[in-house]
Amino acid sequence: MYTDQMRRAFHSIIPPNNFQVELIDNEHFLTIKLDEYVFARMAHDDKIQALQYVLNAKKALEMEGAIVLVTREAIK
């Protein structure tokens, strides 16, 4: 399901410093997975920038026809 156009759209969005997500290709949809441990240690303004990045990446993928789920791994 993850096409070359989706890859280009996803990589055109620049992530904030020291923040990355995992993009998982499920057969019928894509998942953007946040690392909650990294996210929890971020300053407030950095969290806002990170979430804006995730929303922009989600929107870019959806513009290329993807169904996108955003999730995180819970801290235990």
PLM regions and their residue ranges:
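Short aromatic-glycine-(Arg/Gly/Cys) micro-motifs in beta-strand/loop hairpins
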Residues: 20-39
